[in-house]
Amino acid sequence: MKKISSNFFCIFSFLVTQILLAKSNRIFDYSHLKGSKLSINAGPLSSKRAIIPYSFTKLHICNSKRLQRMEDTLGEILTGNKFYSTEYLAKVNEDTFCNILCFNNFTERDVNFYKKLIMRRYFVNMVVDKLPAGLILYNNQTKQTMIRYFDGIPIGYIKNNTFYIFNHLQFHILLNKVDTDKYNVVGFNILPMSIEHGEDTPKCVTRANLLLQNFNKSPQPLKEGRTLFTYDVIYEYSDIPFASRWDHYKISRASIHWTGIFISEFLVGIATIFVICLLRKNLRKDIDSYNYRVSQFEDINEYDWKQVAGDVFRPPSVNKLLLSSMIGTGCQLLSMLSFTLFLAVIGFMNPEKRNNILNIGILFYCFCGLFGGYVSANFYRFWGGNSWIRVSVFTSLLFPGIIICGYMIINIILIIENSNAAVNFSDILSLFILWIFCTFPLILIGSFFGYKSNQINIPCEINKIPSYIPEKPWYLHYRYITFLTGLIGFATIFIEFNYVMGALWRHQIYFLATFLFISIFLFAMVMGELSILVVYYNLCYGDYNWWWKSFIIGASPVIYFGMMAMISGMVILVCGAISVFFCLGFLNKIYSEIRID
């Protein structure tokens, strides 16, 4: 026993050490020497009004064919977060003004594409030293500026029904001096301008103290023909530590997140109080009364939840294989989500490589196939299933099959639209290889042990002949009750879900993993408690077919998640599995308290 404890302590110490080293590596040496080149990279074009991103090369600025694509991870490929090097030249701590980037010849097709991007408010995502650019907004009347993060840099604007293009970018790079001629980049902001240059020479200001006069220049209209692109590079000293350079991105809209948490806690509190009152008052009174009357050999003519003790754990009448596979897949996704969020909460996820969270999530999904296979096979055997191989194959194909079919349809649309988010066949093939050689074998192993392990313990014997189910009130039919429970569950999570999806669609950074973790926990509690209430009241009217009902109640928020079918599929499986376990534990508890003849 001591040896096992010491080995466990060594493994735990090793993991903690690795986590601390991973965290400390972020704040070690990322310094640059004076005069060294800083790469200014550009990512996808994204918009709040449209969901299809485009590649930076679609802008056809200068010779876009010469732009080199940065090294991509699997997460960046799947999310369409592909970055390219640009021809903007920046050297550390060397200010330059009115640099000529190139002369660009716009065709009619280019002009129409730019107009579409401007009308739909597309932004360019640019980075320096892995820091996303903040947008500098300048008010020419008040002579004041403000910085807005997360959106990116606009391509142009519309004024008096005329399209203008931002053809002059002013890069503001914040430096923190580390040593003599050695600096860290701690900030990156861009002030876009529109300047109508001459035919061959730029008209932008070349002196630092006169830069704001560029706003008094005539703007550059979007038109066919020759357009000159220029830029400035300005360095500013800052006392922001390198370890705190991401703070500007983290603190945005935190108060709104707390509002969402408060709403979730309020709904959880109401549901919890209602469930506690029900359990402590009604159930205890019913159990004591029932046990007393049984001990006195009195006739029990009433028909409520106690009278269906011999049927309440009866296996589902239809689709046992499907339900067991869905519960197992839900547990697999829940385990993956828990492990990934835990690493994000403790700060293990590096914001400089923010797409690694998807890479880690994919790996956790593969390894959590052990849990999914175990749970699905255990339930399938409990319900009388006779083949662990069948349930393991079904579990391994259920979620990936739906996702792949949906993703292929979306990918075809993205390819037709020439979107940056389109994924090559070779990348999809790599995911298939990962599934066939990792996920599927682990689900098989988990199913084998789940099928051979002890069955779920129940406090009541199941009657050989099913009891008659009487009529119940219309409002207890799950066709109607799911809309109400789904609305309550959706209200618990929708604020946080809105920010997560906004960051996903606009290729932004989502830092607030703690808020997300709390919201998901509260969401799980609400759906579990609601499913208990619905199942209890159905049992009171003699309806013991609760397995599928509990799953559907937990999955009911999907009604309000709209067209996001793949994400909704994950919500269905996770919430449905949670509801089944909540109801199973609840029924085990209350039926173990009564005496069964």
Predicted segments with their positions:
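Soluble extramembrane domains flanking the early transmembrane region of eukaryotic membrane proteins
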Residues: 20-262
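Transmembrane-helix exit/juxtamembrane "anchor" motif
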Residues: 273-288, 440-458, 526-540, 574-593
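Membrane-water interface at loop-to-transmembrane-helix junctions
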Residues: 312-328, 424-432, 463-489, 509-519
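Hydrophobic alpha-helical transmembrane segments corresponding to the first two to three helices
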Residues: 247-415, 448-453
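Membrane-lumen (extracellular) interface motif
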Residues: 333-367, 373-394, 404-432, 493-516, ...
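Cleavable N-terminal signal peptides of Sec/SRP-targeted secreted and luminal proteins
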Residues: 6-21
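C-terminal transmembrane helix-loop-helix hairpin of multi-pass membrane proteins
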Residues: 473-477, 481, 514-519, 543-597
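Non-transmembrane, juxtamembrane loop and terminal tail segments
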Residues: 293-305, 459-473, 591-597
